[in-house]
Amino acid sequence: MSKVIGIDLGTTNSCVAVLEGGEPKVIANAEGNRTTPSVVAFKNGERQVGEVAKRQSITNPNTIMSIKRHMGTDYKVEIEGKDYTPQEVSAIILQHLKSYAESYLGETVSKAVITVPAYFNDAERQATKDAGKIAGLEVERIINEPTAAALAYGLDKTDEDQTILVYDLGGGTFDVSILELGDGVFEVRSTAGDNRLGGDDFDQVIIDHLVSEFKKENGIDLSKDKMALQRLKDAAEKAKKDLSGVSSTQISLPFITAGEAGPLHLELTLTRAKFEELSSHLVERTMGPVRQALQDAGLSASEIDKVILVGGSTRIPAVQEAIKKETGKEAHKGVNPDEVVALGAAIQGGVITGDVKDVVLLDVTPLSLGIETMGGVFTKLIDRNTTIPTSKSQVFSTAADNQTAVDIHVLQGERPMSADNKTLGRFQLTDIPPAPRGVPQIEVSFDIDKNGIVNVRAKDLGTGKEQNITIKSSSGLSDEEIERMVKEAEENADADAKKKEEIEVRNEADQLVFQTEKTLKDLEGKVDEEQVKKANDAKDALKAAIEKNEFEEIKAKKDELQTIVQELSMKLYEEAAKAQQAQGGANAEGKADDNVVDAEYEEVNDDQNKK
C-alpha cells in the first residue's frame, strides 16, 4: 500500500509527516523549515504558498491568512476578480504540502490523514475533507488534533496505564481533550474547546495596544492603514514570541506612517508583565473548557497523570502557569508543540496501512446531535463525548392532523432551543398517509462515522418509505463544485510545474553562458578561430533569447550551445591528454636523475657516519 502522509492543517502554520521504519518523521519544506506558514498569495496570476507568501504579505493585498477560521462557513474571499472558498484556499496549502512530501519520498502521494480541532463541527470537518479532495488527496481519516498529539506522545508507552490531558492552543483554535492510554488503546474520555480562540487573538491584543499608544502620542489611527496594520501584525507576532524567552522587547517600526510634519516612527518597549495584563482574559478563557472537560470525564485534576501542551501559543509563560495552577501538574516537555499533531497523524496513517499494529483509537463526537421538535425545542439523539463511530434511533410522530410530510431539521450544539444551535442541514420525508396527529411512526436515525461526519435517516415505519442524507451544510460544496475545483487545482498544478520548468531552464541557460565564456578563455589559442567564433555566436544567440524571455527559443538555443560547448570541452581534454603524454615521456627520460638524487642522499648519510 502506498504511503499515507499525516497533515496538521493549521490556522497559522501547517506541518506534514510520514511513517518511516515504524517511526513518524516530519518532512521539511523547500526552505528547510519543518513547518510551513498557512498563507496563500496571488501575484501577477501566480500563486505563492508558505514562507514566500508570508514574506510579501505587507506589500501584497492579495494575501490570504488564517483561512481555517472560516472553514464550514459560506465565507468567500475575492482575489483578482475570482471568488475563493475556504476549501479552495486550504486545498492550495494542502497541494503545497503534498508536493514537497512527494519530493522527499520520491513517489506520488494520494492518501492522507488530516487533523482538525476536536471542537470542529460537522460542517467544518466536511469542508476539510473537501479541501483534501480538491488537492488531489484521498482523505483516509479526519482525526482530532489533541488525539493525534496523544498518539505521538503515547506510541512508545502503550504498556503504561495513564490518564492524560491535552491542552491544544493553536493559531486560531483551542481544544482540550482527556484521554486514557493503556494496552495500545487510546480512548478519548471527553473533549471541549473554543474554535474562535488562538494565537491570533494574543497577537491582536498587542496590535490593539500599539494602535492605542500610537494614537495617544500622534493622534493617528493606524488601524485604518492596511499596510501599517500588516507591519503591526508581524511585529506583534514577533514580540509575542520574544516575550516567551525575555522579560521585555523593543518594538521598532520606522516610517510606519506620515503626519503633517513628515514621517512618523513607532518605538515602544513591551514588557512581559504588560503582555500578561493585556492577554489575561484570553488565558482565563482557556480555563473554562479545561474545567468542562474534567467535569465531562468525571475526573478531578489530581487524577490526571500527564499534561501535554500542543500548539505554538502554549510557549507563552502565562499559559503554562495557568494550566499548572489549574491541574497542579508541570506540563510534559518531551514533545515539540509545533510538530506533535502531524506526527500523530502520520502514526494514524501507519495504523491504516498496517505498519503500526496493536493501536486502537477511540474518539468522541465533540457536540451533541439532534433534531428540532415541536415548539422549536432541540431534542438530542446523540450526546456530546459519545465514542464514535456510533448510531442512535428515536421514533417521532406528526404534530398536526393529516400531515403528509415532515421536515427534519438536523442540529449540533448544547443549547435547549434549536435557534441557538448550529444547523447542519434539513431534509423532508414525504408521502406519509394522512392520519390524526401522533399516529404516524417516524424513526429518525443518526449515524456518525469514524471521521465525525454525520449521516441521518428518516423512515416512516407504516409505509417503509425512507429518506436519508449525508449532512451537507449550507456552506457545503456540491459534488459538481468539488469536481470543478479538483480540475482547476490540477490545471494550476500543471501551470505551476510549467513555471518551475521555465525558471529552471532559464537558470541553466544563464549558467551555460557563464560556463561558455570560461571555457573559451581556457581554450584561447588552443583551438581553431572558426570554432571559437561558432561558440561565441551561439552564446550571443542564447543571451538574446534570455533577454526576450522566449521559453521555447531559450530551450532550443541552450541545447544548440550545449552541443558546441561539449565539442570544445572535448578539445580541452584532448589537449590536456596530449600534455600529459608529453610529460610522461619527459619523466621516463629523467629516471637517471632519480638515481643521482638517491646517491646524493646516500652521500649525506656517509657524512653523518663520519661524524
From Swiss-Prot:
Triggers of expression: By heat shock.
CDD domains: ASKHA_NBD_HSP70_DnaK-like (cd10234)
Phosphothreonine PTM sites in chain numbering: 173
Region span, Disordered: 579-611
Record-level GO BP terms: chaperone cofactor-dependent protein refolding; protein refolding
GO molecular-function term, one example from the UniProt record: ATP binding
One GO CC term on file: extracellular region
Top-rank lineage group of the source organism: Bacteria
Pfam (any one): HSP70
UniProt subcellular location: Cytoplasm; Secreted
Keywords tagged on the record: ATP-binding, Chaperone, Cytoplasm, Nucleotide-binding, Phosphoprotein, Secreted, Stress response
UniProt biased composition (Acidic residues): 595-611
Keyword hit for Transmembrane: no
Low complexity bias spans: 579-589
Gene3D superfamilies: 1.20.1270.10, 3.30.420.40, Actin, Chain A, domain 4, Substrate Binding Domain Of DNAk, Chain A, domain 1
Function: Acts as a chaperone.
Family to which this protein belongs: Belongs to the heat shock protein 70 family.
Name the UniProt record assigns to this protein: Chaperone protein DnaK
Species: Bacillus subtilis (strain 168)
Gene from which the chain derives: dnaK
